[in-house]
């Protein structure tokens, strides 16, 4: 005989660190060069190369242009995640400066040179990312940074870089597995318990999920390795903000094929990418990201199953708390991870 356990999910109203940023609202740095849209999901979207501002007092120090379509696609991705989670908000950090005057995917001296305003914008970009990471760590216990770029490689695919280069992806599974602790998803695939090969190139990898929706992607079951093709396997920011060196926030370097981000494809691609991101997070992190005002999740449990204790992510026994990931330990040895959002 079974009984139903009902979990009520309510509209989120989560505080953000000491500043209490409001989910869905924009906050700007000096001169509006950098924008932070606060969120309440364990998802961060980084947009470093979509800006077009070229103030006269900021010198051109980089010979590079905008990742065309990345600004618009990132905003559509943001909107689509809100829609597909029934009102939850991802975090998003945007550089509005043209990357030729400040390139936030490099260390500061290379990125901004000696110009004080450019250097300040660099700090703002990364400080806003750190703010969102701090909030996610406190409220969810883990999360993921997705940095949006564009590529024009002749293979015509979106590239998902997790810190594993083509030299390893082109090799055996055992060779790929040897890179687990050197990847930008180290936390997810060690402490988080996710299968590294699946996260890298399986059907439920981000590339696999996107590829299954008709958008050619690598790595994925269709393209398990780049072979000799073009492939960006990581960037300075995904090393910095992912879990390679520390922390519980993982990172993906998302090199979107530029044609996918063109006007004719942009809406559908963004919608499919958002669904892929949400599926990836739910599958590998075990999250339920749904901000429906009144919705019920039904979980079947055996009638003789008794709750022994509830613990936080550090294993400390704790009473039930909202907006916090908790572990429910039962007398049959099973453990359930849940978060109740209000």
Where are the regions a protein language model picked out?
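Sec-dependent N-terminal signal peptides
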Residues: 4-15
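Boundary of Sec targeting at the N-terminus
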Residues: 17-18, 316
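N-terminal catalytic or cofactor-binding beta/alpha core of small enzyme domains
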Residues: 18-290
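Residue-level detector of functionally pivotal "anchor" positions at catalytic/ligand-binding pockets or at interdomain
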Residues: 290-317
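A sequence-level detector of short linear motifs
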Residues: 317-319, 336-337
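Extracellular Ig-like/FN3 beta-sandwich strand-entry sites
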Residues: 321-323
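C-terminal tail/sorting-segment detector
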Residues: 325-342
